[in-house]
Every structure is written in C-alpha cells, then in structure tokens.
UniProtKB/Swiss-Prot annotation:
The keyword Cell membrane does not apply. PANTHER family: C6 FINGER DOMAIN-CONTAINING PROTEIN, ZN(2)-C6 FUNGAL-TYPE DOMAIN-CONTAINING PROTEIN-RELATED. Keywords: Stress response. The keyword Cytoplasm does not apply. The lineage of its organism: Eukaryota, Fungi, Dikarya, Ascomycota, Pezizomycotina. It comes from the Eukaryota. Involved in osmoadaptation. Induction: Up-regulated when grown with elevated levels of potassium chloride. Residues 1-60 are annotated as: Disordered. This is Uncharacterized protein AN5342. It comes from Emericella nidulans (strain FGSC A4 / ATCC 38163 / CBS 112.46 / NRRL 194 / M139).
Length: 467
C-alpha cells in the first residue's frame, strides 16, 4: 500500500489500485465503507488505501491493464533485433536457393559480394526500404511454402511499405544512386513478377531499374555489390526490351565495355574457365536481339524503295549475330565437355560448382542460345523469304531439341513451328508475347526465376512468326 498525501482528492475518487508499501502505517477496518474513508480524509486523518480494489459492485471502480515487457527486450533491447535479423538472413538464403538455385550457385563466386552476403552483412538494420522489400519476398516465399494466407497478406503490406520508402529515397539524387535503392528496386521487381498485381507492373519496375542504372553509370556496377545486382537483373532487361519493342540499352558501347571488363575480371579468378568466358560472350550476342527485332519491324513499315536501301545492311547484321551465336553454341558444348571429362558419374562436384547446379545452368543457358537463334531465323525469313526452306529445317531441329529438354510447367505453352505457310499471301510478322502474366506466373518456391535469368531473359517471352 502507498500513502495518499493530503489534497489528492482525485486519487481517492478514482480508487486506484496500489502496490504494497514496505512500511504501512494504519490499515482501515474491513467494514469501513468508501464514504467513511472519505470523511476521515476530509477531517485530516491519514487514510491508507487497501492493496486490492473495492468490490465490483462499486460503480466508481476502474481497472487498467499493466503492459508487460518481453524479458529479452527489457534486459538487452538488441537481442530481439539480432534474433529476427538472423532468422531473416536464413529465410532469405532459402528463398534464393529455391528461386535462383542454378544461377546463384554458378555466379556467386564471380562477384565480390553476393546477395546472401549483402543481406547478412547488414546486421540489425530492419527499418529500411531494402529490408522491407526483402521481408516482402521472404514472407511470400513462406506463404507459398506453407500454404499460409497470413504470410501472403503480410507480404503485400510489406511490398507497399517498401514502395513508399523507395519513393522517399528517390527524392534525392544522392540517395537514388546508392546500392540500397537499386537493390530495393530489384527485390521489389522480383516480387512483382511472382505476384503480377497488374499486367504491366513488372515493366514499370524494369523501366525504373533501367533509369537507376543509367543514373549510376556503368562503372558503379563493376565492383562490389553493384556487380551482383547488375549480373542478376541484366537478363530481365532483355525480356523487357523485347516485350516493349525497343532496343536494349546494354547494347550501347559504354555498357558493352562493362560486360567486357566483367569477362576479363572473371578470367583472372581461380575458379575461372572457358565455360564462364563463353557464357559472357553469349550474353553479348543476345543483347543485340531486341535492337534487331525493332529495326526489322521498322523496315516492314518502309516503302519498297527505302526498304531496298536499308535491308541489305540489316540482313547482314542479323546474319552476323546468328553466326556468332552459332559459334557460341558450339564453343559452349566443347567447354561443358571439357569440364565433364574425367568426372565419375558419382562425383559430387564439377570444379567449384556442384554437379546438380552445373548441369541445370548449362542446360538452361543452351536453351537460351537456341531461343536466340530461333528469333534471328524469324528475322531472316521476314527479310529474305528465299531462305525459308533452309530455315524451316533448322528451326525444326532447334524446337525439337528444346521440346526434349522442356522444363516449363505450362504444357499449353509447348513450342510449335509458328511459321506461316510458304505460299501464304501477305508479309509475315513477328509477334512477341510476355510470359510474365497472371496466368503464367509461378510461385517463389519454384525455379521460374532461375529459368528466366539462366536463359538470358528469353524464357520469359514467346516469339512467333505469323502472317
């Protein structure tokens, strides 16, 4: 019990619950009513309130809950933060290995800081735009993994919170150039591909990331975590360029130079091989495809006279790119065979990369090269119909190879020969359809993102030639 000082009428009226006092003075009689206690108080006599509340029949009684503090947070406020952060890093690692298994394991040694290391190194940073974006992805992953709608609802809330935080950071050019802003934008873009909140939302994300990369400049993506961000998202930029009908800005000389510097840097690594060099050169060829598609479409809109002037140079560029990609395909097969040579079937590792991931990544990259050759063949048919018979035969072999190695979970999207009959009237035209839609999207527990990135973005589009 605590002693109530003179003049504290409101305390008496409220009849607050009190805590025991180490030196109580005078206890009231159990038979005394509240009115009798009040009369003693007014006469100047000390009144000691009981340590328990008055009976519930009193209309003036008031009870207030006392908030409880978590013991860990009370003793050391950082304990809870550290525990949550540790769990978050582990869940993010599981998410990356589920969504990007082959691509991550085959590229993690090519970057100074990979994505898992970056998340782990951030320590107890939990109230930032990037961390909200990461938690949005991991919550969606857990919701899909355990079929729990609570996680999915929470992930959307975190997604919108991260978007607002990203908007605040973009208000300053200095912060807009930071690694955290680009990393947040990339994580949110990946989240959007899995959720498809609107048909073109992922394209808006891609446009924003393209702007951020240009603002930062190529050199910002050569070292540190910048390289990891660039390597993982550059493939989606090819997808976006094809869907939008535009050339990919990575084809520009300064960005081509960046890719060449990355390839040269990779060649100096202890884990480097002909395999990684061929992969980089294959990417350099594929980034030209969106620009060639755009130029071919523009060619079809020209008059016959103007078309006759422009077409030879364009056809030569397409054929040169196709020849280069064919060479890459052959070299890649040789490089893979060299790495496999001397390996027993039961061996766990092929070089520094586990056999499972190596085989998966090799298969997907080869598929991406075939898809690139298929698109280039379509462009040649549009400009030079005389090559139709030869190209039909080659396309049949390419599609047959891809059907045998088909990994897509969408049977309805199996590849067919989408060529117009050779004698059909009218000009054939190229149709590019996005496969990042509400109907074709896959959850983050699948390797859908892995298939897109490892095929250099070409797995996310369906290209056909129609008349």
């Amino acid at each position: 019990m605590v002693r109530v000082s003179r003049g504290c009428q409101s305390c008496v009226d409220a009849k607050l619950q009190s805590t025991p006092s180490p030196s109580p003075s005078k206890s009231p009689s159990p038979t005394e009513s509240p009115e009798q206690c009040l009369q003693k108080r007014q006469s100047g006599e000390q009144v000691v309130l009981p340590s328990r509340p008055f009976p519930r029949t009193s209309p003036r009684a008031e009870y207030r809950p006392v908030p409880l503090l978590a013991l860990d947070g009370y003793i050391n406020p950082s304990l809870t933060v550290t525990a949550v952060n540790s769990q978050q890093a582990q869940v993010f690692t599981n998410y990356v290995l589920a969504s990007f298994p082959c691509f991550f394991r085959c590229t993690e040694t090519r970057v100074p800081v990979n994505w898992v290391e970056y998340v782990d190194q951030r320590g107890s940073s939990m109230n930032s735009c990037f961390d909200w974006a990461v938690r949005a992805c991991t919550s969606a992953y857990l919701g899909s993994l355990h079929d729990d709608q609570r996680y999915l609802v929470a992930s959307r809330s975190l997604y919108h919170r991260a978007l607002r935080g990203l908007g605040n950071l973009l208000s300053s050019e200095k912060t807009a150039k930071s690694d955290e802003v680009l990393a947040s934008a990339i994580v949110l873009a990946i989240f959007e591909k899995h959720n498809c909140s609107s048909p073109d939302a992922w394209l808006r994300h891609a446009a924003g990331i393209r702007t951020l990369m240009k603002l930062r400049g190529p050199k910002a993506h050569l070292e540190g975590f910048g390289r990891a961000m660039y390597i993982v998202y550059r493939n989606f930029l090819i997808t976006a360029a094809l869907v939008e009908g535009e050339a990919c800005f990575l084809e520009e000389p300064e960005w081509q130079a960046l890719n060449e510097e990355i390839a040269a840097s990779d060649a100096k690594l202890p884990t480097s091989s002909l395999y990684t060099d061929v992969v980089e050169r294959g990417f350099l060829s594929v980034i030209k495809i969106p620009g060639l598609v755009k130029r071919t479409r523009e060619l079809q809109c020209l008059s016959s006279k103007k078309r006759a002037e422009v077409q030879p140079a364009l056809l030569q560029d397409v054929q040169a790119t196709r020849a280069g990609l064919r060479g890459i395909y052959t070299e890649f097969g040789v490089a893979v065979s060299m790495l496999r040579s001397g390996q027993d079937e039961n061996d766990t590792f092929v070089g520094p990369v586990p056999n499972f991931f190596f085989e998966g990544y090799s298969s997907l990259f080869a598929r991406g090269v075939r898809l690139g050759l298929l698109i280039l063949n379509y462009l040649i048919v549009i400009m030079d119909p005389k090559q139709r018979a030869t190209i039909d035969s080659e396309n049949f072999m390419l599609l047959n190879d891809m059907t045998r190695s088909q990994r897509s979970t969408h049977p309805a999207l199996e590849f067919k020969l989408p060529l117009t009959p050779p004698k059909s009237p009218g000009r054939p035209g190229l149709v590019v359809r996005s496969l990042i839609t509400e109907e074709t999207r896959e959850p983050p527990t699948t390797d859908w993102m892995d298939r897109i990135t490892s095929t250099m973005g070409l797995e996310a589009v369906h290209v056909s030639l129609v008349g």
